[in-house]
Regions:
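Short amphipathic alpha-helix that is part of the acyltransferase structural core
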Residues: 4-66
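Residue-level detector of beta-propeller blades
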Residues: 22, 69, 151-152
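A conserved beta-strand-loop-helix scaffold within acyl/acetyltransferase catalytic domains
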Residues: 49-67, 71-90, 94
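Short strand-loop junctions, especially beta-strand C-caps/beta-turns
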Residues: 96-101, 130-134
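Conserved acetyl-CoA-binding loop-helix of GNAT-fold acetyltransferases
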Residues: 98, 104-119
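Conserved GNAT acetyl-CoA-binding A-motif
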Residues: 119-134
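Conserved active-site alpha-helix within GNAT-family acetyltransferase domains
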Residues: 133-156
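C-terminal "cap" of GNAT-fold acetyltransferases
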Residues: 157-186
Length: 187
């Protein structure tokens, strides 16, 4: 990767450097939380911000571009994730999102690399994230995950998959809890 001024050259392609900020309890109220929520006065926004504020105490990290609604990554220690997974010393990525018009410029790579560096600094053994065999809304793109070295760790009957990126060969493979692998409604 070469740089020139504010621009970076990735694979010979010149791209504008995007600046990032970590959202914390201290700046949460003034920051836009680029998510599927567009109206900043909506009750969903205040609910999401309240949820985030509580999760920061559990180790949640929210890293986003300073440009409103462009790209972000949200992750938390897997033991605190709001998903039925079993794993030790992994980081769970709640969301990795880049605005469609900005895809292909390396922004998701920058965010993912920041997550990896932070996770390793915290002594974690790897990352995990939800996806599916075929791309589904609000789930990570399986082609992107495979491209970045993630592998399928487990799959539920509803085709939802748990993907993981171990930092070493000794890292235990995460899994779904038994209650979700074969979901049934009992009457």
């Amino acid at each position: 990767m070469k740089t020139k001024g504010d621009n970076v050259f990735l694979s010979g392609k010149e791209v504008l450097v995007m600046k990032y900020i970590q959202v914390t309890k201290e700046n949460l109220e003034k920051e836009h939380i680029c998510c599927a929520i567009s109206n900043t006065k909506d009750a969903q926004v205040s609910s999401k911000k309240a949820w985030l504020s509580e999760r920061f105490d559990e180790g949640l990290v929210f890293l986003k571009s300073v440009e409103r609604g462009k790209c972000f990554i949200e992750y938390i220690p897997a033991e605190k994730a709001w998903n039925p997974i079993e794993t030790e010393d992994y980081i769970y990525i709640d969301c990795l999102w880049v605005l469609g018009s900005l895809k292909g410029h390396g922004y998701s790579t920058v965010l993912l690399e920041a997550c990896i560096a932070d996770s390793k600094a915290k002594g974690k053994k790897g990352l995990c994230i939800l996806s599916a065999a075929k791309k589904k809304p609000f789930l990570a793109d399986p082609k992107y995950l495979a491209y970045k070295g993630f592998k399928v760790a487990d799959e539920a009957d509803n085709d939802i998959q748990l993907w993981y990126l171990p930092f070493s060969n000794e890292a235990k493979v995460p899994s779904f809890k038994a209650c979700v692998k074969h979901s049934h409604i009992f009457m």
